[in-house]
Amino acid sequence: TLLNAPRPVRIAFLGDSFVEGDILTADLRERLQSAYSGGGAGFAPMASPLTAFRRTVKTQSKGWTTYNIMQRKAAPARLRENFYVSGWVSQPAAGASTRWESTDYRKRLDSCTTARVFFLSPRDSRVEVTLNDAQRREFDIAGDDAVRQIAVSAPRVRSLAFKVLSGAEDFVGYGAVFEGRGVVVDNYSVRSNNGQAMFWTNPSVNAQINAMLGYDLVVLQY
């Protein structure tokens, strides 16, 4: 069965402001993880003006310019063409960074064992990843149009930091996923979205990230 598979059972919950800030999905995640194991808060955007409302993960970001798919016409063409189903894309200035930290708002949020960061780096870039404010490593990223993933694992992932050291031009930040073996629930809420925004996302970006994560169930709430 899926629960015995060597990877998490992954659920994507796509909705509007009804689930914004992890409302409803926080309770669903807690119940499923308590019943079937798993941990972590799932997907969290690289940067968003709404992060302060979400209590299941603490996000601190600086140096990013973030665009929402509902206001996609305000985004530069390069970003406008590369939206993911999360509805957010972030463009960094040199030295832009984000730090995510687990909370105790719900059970098992601190049982995260793997974290993954997703981004686009069409040009050569250099990024820094810091695990639990202690283990730091720099990565040289060769320019390519494919979605990139950096994954880290530990007995307990309490925090993760990501920084763009160089190559910020055309770089696109999507966010990070925090998970543990068992059930993962990713909240993809977009305010004022009636479902039509999915047609404004990039099918290739969606397919590439799905190939890396592998969703078993997609819930649509509009």
PLM segments and residue spans:
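A short acidic-Thr-Gly-centered motif at the start of a beta-strand
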Residues: 2-7
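Conserved SGNH/GDSL esterase-like catalytic core that processes O-acyl groups on lipids
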Residues: 20-222
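Short hydrophobic beta-strand that contains or immediately precedes a catalytic carboxylate
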Residues: 11-15
